[in-house]
Protein backbone atom coordinates (compact mmCIF):
# COMPACT_ATOMS: atom_id res chain seq x y z
CA UNK A 1 0.00 0.00 0.00
CA UNK A 2 2.75 2.43 0.95
CA UNK A 3 4.61 1.76 -2.31
CA UNK A 4 1.54 2.63 -4.37
CA UNK A 5 1.08 5.93 -2.55
CA UNK A 6 4.82 6.64 -2.74
CA UNK A 7 4.76 6.09 -6.51
CA UNK A 8 2.08 8.76 -6.90
CA UNK A 9 4.17 11.28 -4.98
CA UNK A 10 7.27 10.36 -6.99
CA UNK A 11 5.38 10.78 -10.25
CA UNK A 12 4.33 14.27 -9.15
CA UNK A 13 7.89 15.15 -8.11
CA UNK A 14 9.39 13.94 -11.39
CA UNK A 15 6.90 15.94 -13.43
CA UNK A 16 7.82 19.13 -11.59
CA UNK A 17 11.64 19.13 -11.27
CA UNK A 18 14.64 19.04 -13.60
CA UNK A 19 17.66 16.76 -13.14
CA UNK A 20 19.65 19.22 -10.98
CA UNK A 21 16.65 19.85 -8.74
CA UNK A 22 16.02 16.11 -8.58
CA UNK A 23 19.54 15.48 -7.27
CA UNK A 24 19.01 18.12 -4.55
CA UNK A 25 15.59 16.65 -3.78
CA UNK A 26 17.09 13.18 -3.35
CA UNK A 27 19.89 14.58 -1.19
CA UNK A 28 17.38 16.29 1.10
CA UNK A 29 15.19 13.19 1.31
CA UNK A 30 18.27 11.10 2.14
CA UNK A 31 19.08 13.34 5.10
CA UNK A 32 15.54 13.02 6.41
CA UNK A 33 15.33 9.31 5.69
CA UNK A 34 18.47 8.73 7.75
CA UNK A 35 16.66 10.28 10.71
CA UNK A 36 13.89 7.69 10.34
CA UNK A 37 16.43 5.06 11.45
CA UNK A 38 16.30 6.60 14.94
CA UNK A 39 13.43 5.29 17.06
CA UNK A 40 12.94 8.57 18.96
CA UNK A 41 12.51 10.41 15.67
CA UNK A 42 9.88 7.91 14.50
CA UNK A 43 8.10 8.29 17.84
CA UNK A 44 8.00 12.08 17.46
CA UNK A 45 6.63 11.82 13.92
CA UNK A 46 3.92 9.39 15.02
CA UNK A 47 2.83 11.43 18.07
CA UNK A 48 -0.90 12.09 17.72
CA UNK A 49 -0.77 15.10 20.06
CA UNK A 50 1.72 17.00 17.90
CA UNK A 51 0.24 19.03 15.05
CA UNK A 52 1.10 17.92 11.53
CA UNK A 53 2.40 21.38 10.65
CA UNK A 54 4.80 21.22 13.61
CA UNK A 55 6.00 17.80 12.46
CA UNK A 56 6.61 19.17 8.95
CA UNK A 57 8.56 22.14 10.34
CA UNK A 58 10.58 19.78 12.53
CA UNK A 59 11.48 17.68 9.48
CA UNK A 60 12.35 20.76 7.45
CA UNK A 61 14.70 21.88 10.23
CA UNK A 62 16.85 18.81 9.48
CA UNK A 63 17.58 20.01 5.94
CA UNK A 64 19.97 22.83 5.13
CA UNK A 65 18.64 25.31 2.59
CA UNK A 66 15.60 23.42 1.24
CA UNK A 67 14.06 24.65 -2.01
CA UNK A 68 10.54 26.05 -2.13
CA UNK A 69 9.34 22.91 -3.93
CA UNK A 70 10.83 20.73 -1.21
CA UNK A 71 9.25 22.80 1.57
CA UNK A 72 5.87 22.57 -0.13
CA UNK A 73 6.31 18.83 -0.62
CA UNK A 74 7.07 18.20 3.07
CA UNK A 75 4.19 20.46 4.13
CA UNK A 76 1.88 18.53 1.79
CA UNK A 77 3.01 15.23 3.27
CA UNK A 78 2.41 16.67 6.74
CA UNK A 79 -1.06 17.92 5.85
CA UNK A 80 -1.98 14.50 4.45
CA UNK A 81 -0.45 12.67 7.45
CA UNK A 82 2.02 10.87 5.20
CA UNK A 83 5.37 11.94 6.68
CA UNK A 84 6.13 8.33 7.55
CA UNK A 85 6.24 7.58 3.81
CA UNK A 86 9.47 9.55 3.30
CA UNK A 87 11.78 6.47 3.30
CA UNK A 88 9.49 4.67 0.81
CA UNK A 89 9.36 7.79 -1.38
CA UNK A 90 13.16 8.01 -1.29
CA UNK A 91 13.54 4.37 -2.37
CA UNK A 92 11.03 4.83 -5.17
CA UNK A 93 12.54 8.08 -6.41
CA UNK A 94 16.02 6.52 -6.44
CA UNK A 95 14.79 3.61 -8.53
CA UNK A 96 13.05 6.00 -10.93
CA UNK A 97 16.22 8.06 -11.21
CA UNK A 98 18.25 4.99 -12.15
CA UNK A 99 15.69 4.21 -14.84
CA UNK A 100 15.91 7.77 -16.16
CA UNK A 101 19.71 7.70 -16.12
CA UNK A 102 19.76 4.15 -17.57
CA UNK A 103 21.89 2.90 -14.66
CA UNK A 104 21.23 -0.49 -13.12
CA UNK A 105 22.72 -2.00 -9.98
CA UNK A 106 23.43 -5.67 -9.45
CA UNK A 107 25.27 -8.15 -7.30
CA UNK A 108 27.86 -10.82 -7.96
CA UNK A 109 27.93 -13.84 -5.65
CA UNK A 110 30.56 -16.54 -5.52
CA UNK A 111 32.64 -18.65 -3.18
CA UNK A 112 35.63 -16.41 -3.90
CA UNK A 113 36.34 -12.68 -3.87
CA UNK A 114 36.38 -10.77 -7.15
CA UNK A 115 38.89 -7.96 -7.46
CA UNK A 116 38.04 -4.53 -8.87
CA UNK A 117 39.42 -5.36 -12.30
CA UNK A 118 37.24 -8.46 -12.62
CA UNK A 119 34.16 -6.56 -11.45
CA UNK A 120 34.76 -3.75 -13.94
CA UNK A 121 35.21 -6.31 -16.75
CA UNK A 122 31.85 -7.87 -15.83
CA UNK A 123 30.26 -4.41 -15.64
CA UNK A 124 31.56 -3.57 -19.13
CA UNK A 125 30.28 -6.83 -20.62
CA UNK A 126 26.83 -6.48 -19.08
CA UNK A 127 26.69 -2.77 -20.00
CA UNK A 128 27.33 -3.62 -23.65
CA UNK A 129 24.88 -6.51 -23.56
CA UNK A 130 21.99 -4.47 -22.18
CA UNK A 131 22.95 -1.08 -23.66
CA UNK A 132 22.87 0.49 -20.20
CA UNK A 133 25.28 1.43 -17.44
CA UNK A 134 25.60 -1.52 -15.06
CA UNK A 135 27.16 -1.22 -11.59
CA UNK A 136 28.01 -4.44 -9.77
CA UNK A 137 28.88 -5.12 -6.17
CA UNK A 138 30.66 -8.32 -5.24
CA UNK A 139 30.18 -10.46 -2.19
CA UNK A 140 31.50 -13.81 -1.07
CA UNK A 141 28.91 -16.51 -0.39
CA UNK A 142 28.50 -20.27 -0.16
CA UNK A 143 27.41 -20.52 -3.81
CA UNK A 144 29.75 -22.99 -5.57
CA UNK A 145 30.33 -21.02 -8.76
CA UNK A 146 29.40 -17.50 -9.74
CA UNK A 147 26.03 -15.77 -9.96
CA UNK A 148 25.24 -12.30 -11.30
CA UNK A 149 21.86 -10.76 -10.41
CA UNK A 150 20.47 -7.59 -11.99
CA UNK A 151 17.11 -7.24 -10.25
CA UNK A 152 15.98 -4.08 -12.02
CA UNK A 153 16.49 -5.74 -15.40
CA UNK A 154 15.12 -9.08 -14.23
CA UNK A 155 18.33 -10.89 -15.17
CA UNK A 156 20.17 -13.64 -13.35
CA UNK A 157 23.18 -15.38 -14.88
CA UNK A 158 24.95 -18.18 -13.08
CA UNK A 159 27.63 -20.79 -13.53
CA UNK A 160 27.58 -23.61 -11.02
CA UNK A 161 30.47 -26.00 -10.56
CA UNK A 162 28.10 -28.66 -9.20
CA UNK A 163 25.89 -28.40 -12.26
CA UNK A 164 28.92 -28.62 -14.57
CA UNK A 165 30.11 -31.78 -12.81
CA UNK A 166 26.64 -33.34 -13.10
CA UNK A 167 26.33 -32.50 -16.79
CA UNK A 168 29.81 -33.83 -17.54
CA UNK A 169 29.02 -37.08 -15.70
CA UNK A 170 25.77 -37.47 -17.65
CA UNK A 171 27.55 -36.80 -20.94
CA UNK A 172 30.26 -39.35 -20.18
CA UNK A 173 27.67 -41.95 -19.17
CA UNK A 174 25.70 -41.36 -22.38
CA UNK A 175 28.87 -41.71 -24.44
CA UNK A 176 29.63 -45.10 -22.89
Swiss-Prot record:
What are the UniProt keywords, alphabetically? ATP synthesis, Cell inner membrane, Cell membrane, CF(1), Hydrogen ion transport, Ion transport, Membrane, Transport
Provide the membrane topology annotation: Peripheral membrane protein
Q: Look up keyword Chloroplast and say if it applies.
A: no
| Highest taxon of the lineage | Bacteria
Concerning SUPFAM superfamilies, the annotation shows:
N-terminal domain of the delta subunit of the F1F0-ATP synthase (SSF47928)
Return any one Pfam family short name: OSCP
Query: Is Cell membrane a UniProt keyword of this protein?
Result: yes
Q: Where in the cell is it found?
A: Cell inner membrane
Show the GO MF annotations: proton-transporting ATP synthase activity, rotational mechanism
**InterPro entries with a match to the protein in the record:** ATP_synth_OSCP/delta_N_sf, ATPase_OSCP/dsu
| A GO CC term assigned to this protein in UniProt | plasma membrane
Q: Which NCBIfam families match?
A: PRK08474.1
Indicate the family of this protein: Belongs to the ATPase delta chain family.
The free-text function statement in the UniProt record for this protein reads: F(1)F(0) ATP synthase produces ATP from ADP in the presence of a proton or sodium gradient. F-type ATPases consist of two structural domains, F(1) containing the extramembraneous catalytic core and F(0) containing the membrane proton channel, linked together by a central stalk and a peripheral stalk. During catalysis, ATP synthesis in the catalytic domain of F(1) is coupled via a rotary mechanism of the central stalk subunits to proton translocation. This protein is part of the stalk that links CF(0) to CF(1). It either transmits conformational changes from CF(0) to CF(1) or is implicated in proton conduction.
Q: How does it assemble?
A: F-type ATPases have 2 components, F(1) - the catalytic core - and F(0) - the membrane proton channel. F(1) has five subunits: alpha(3), beta(3), gamma(1), delta(1), epsilon(1). F(0) has three main subunits: a(1), b(2) and c(10-14). The alpha and beta chains form an alternating ring which encloses part of the gamma chain. F(1) is attached to F(0) by a central stalk formed by the gamma and epsilon chains, while a peripheral stalk is formed by the delta and b chains.
Protein name listed in UniProt: ATP synthase subunit delta
Q: Which gene encodes it?
A: atpH
Amino acid sequence: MNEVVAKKYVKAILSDVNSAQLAKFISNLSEISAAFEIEKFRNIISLPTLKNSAKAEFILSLVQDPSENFKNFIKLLGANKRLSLIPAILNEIKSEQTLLDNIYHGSVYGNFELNGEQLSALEDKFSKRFDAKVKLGGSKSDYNGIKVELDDLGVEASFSMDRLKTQMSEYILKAI
